[in-house]
């Protein structure tokens, strides 16, 4: 097989070069998989710098696409494992990086494949497809697979992740993420920095794992999702299904929250409420 010189030397800053490569490989960017290419080199560099890769660290990249970020990451890490669901992109990645000793390509859906890989990794990186970003983050938390992560996501989702108590964006997802990670906003990215240009702005976030005191994650997650599904209701009207012992309601700590709505309760307070309810089970 004769490899295409153009495809092997993609100018990631050039829409013309990207278009030509896609045309050559008969690839049409798929919205379903968030196939928008970041064409601003300085932004790419800034995002990678935020990973702060140390010597000997092992990195996972979810959805490398044409390999713009992959190319930079491979210069900084001893081992990069890339998960790519699109077989046509996998072919390009293999051609460009397959002979490098520090590159490993996993073909298929990250959520279905990652458990089969060596879990001894240090950091995870991705420009996450907008439609699955919350699913990926939630799944990693639910599986207690907590690593330092840098993700670029839809700004609307980032606003929920970084939301403060008493704000409209404060949600169950806010509580889920902030209970497990310190969240740092790296930068906002305008639509014109991508090809094809998405209809929404993007934001890059850094998630750093932190310790918490959640006694029963399953019950905590269920509690938070339930009360936020009725966010205009006061807590006393939504936690009734979690109370198996009426003595729970006499807890002085719990009493002060019964007349509050979920957006008025902090992440740490949700943890304490969940632990209190769990103690009476």
Swiss-Prot record:
Cited SMART domains: rADc (SM00650)
Keyword S-adenosyl-L-methionine: yes
SUPFAM superfamilies to which the protein is assigned, alphabetical: S-adenosyl-L-methionine-dependent methyltransferases
Primary location group: cytoplasm
InterPro entries hit by this protein: KsgA/Erm, rRNA_Ade_diMease-like_C, rRNA_Ade_Mease_Trfase_CS, rRNA_Ade_methylase_Trfase_N, rRNA_adenine_dimethylase, SAM-dependent_MTases_sf
Binding-site positions, S-adenosyl-L-methionine: 36, 38, 63, 84, 109, 127
Gene3D superfamilies per UniProt: Ribosomal RNA adenine dimethylase-like, domain 2, Vaccinia Virus protein VP39
GO cellular component: cytosol
Location(s) in or outside the cell: Cytoplasm
Keywords: Cytoplasm, Methyltransferase, RNA-binding, rRNA processing, S-adenosyl-L-methionine, Transferase
One MF annotation (Gene Ontology) recorded for this entry: RNA binding
Reactions that this protein is recorded to catalyse: adenosine(1518)/adenosine(1519) in 16S rRNA + 4 S-adenosyl-L-methionine = N(6)-dimethyladenosine(1518)/N(6)-dimethyladenosine(1519) in 16S rRNA + 4 S-adenosyl-L-homocysteine + 4 H(+)
EC number: 2.1.1.182
UniProt entry tagged with the keyword ATP-binding: no
Job of this protein: Specifically dimethylates two adjacent adenosines (A1518 and A1519) in the loop of a conserved hairpin near the 3'-end of 16S rRNA in the 30S particle. May play a critical role in biogenesis of 30S subunits.
Similarity field: Belongs to the class I-like SAM-binding methyltransferase superfamily. rRNA adenine N(6)-methyltransferase family. RsmA subfamily.
Protein name (record): Ribosomal RNA small subunit methyltransferase A
């Amino acid at each position: 097989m004769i490899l295409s010189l153009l495809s092997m030397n993609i100018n990631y800053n050039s829409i013309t070069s990207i278009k030509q490569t896609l045309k050559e490989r008969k690839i049409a960017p798929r919205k379903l998989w968030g196939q928008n290419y970041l064409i601003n080199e300085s932004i790419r560099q800034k995002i990678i710098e935020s990973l702060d890769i140390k010597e000997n660290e092992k990195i996972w990249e979810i959805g490398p696409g044409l390999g713009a970020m992959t190319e930079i990451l491979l210069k900084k890490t001893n081992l990069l494992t890339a998960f790519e669901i699109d077989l046509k992109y996998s072919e390009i990645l293999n051609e460009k990086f397959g002979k490098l000793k520090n590159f490993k390509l996993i073909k298929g859906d990250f959520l279905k494949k990652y458990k089969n890989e060596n879990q001894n990794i240090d950091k995870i990186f991705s420009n996450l497809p907008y439609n699955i970003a919350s699913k990926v983050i939630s799944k990693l938390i639910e599986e207690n697979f907590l690593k330092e992560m840098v993700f670029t996501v839809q700004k609307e989702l980032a606003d929920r992740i970084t939301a403060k108590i008493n704000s409209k964006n404060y949600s169950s997802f806010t509580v889920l993420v902030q209970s497990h990670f310190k969240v740092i906003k790296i930068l906002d990215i305008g639509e014109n920095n991508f090809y094809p240009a998405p209809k929404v702005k993007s934001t890059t976030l850094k998630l750093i794992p932190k310790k918490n005191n959640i006694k029963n994650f399953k019950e905590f997650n269920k509690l938070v999702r339930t009360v936020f599904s009725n966010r205009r209701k006061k807590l006393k009207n939504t936690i009734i299904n979690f109370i198996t012992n009426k003595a729970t309601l006499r807890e002085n700590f719990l009493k002060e929250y019964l007349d509050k709505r979920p957006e008025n309760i902090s992440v740490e307070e949700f943890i304490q409420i969940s632990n209190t309810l769990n103690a009476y089970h």
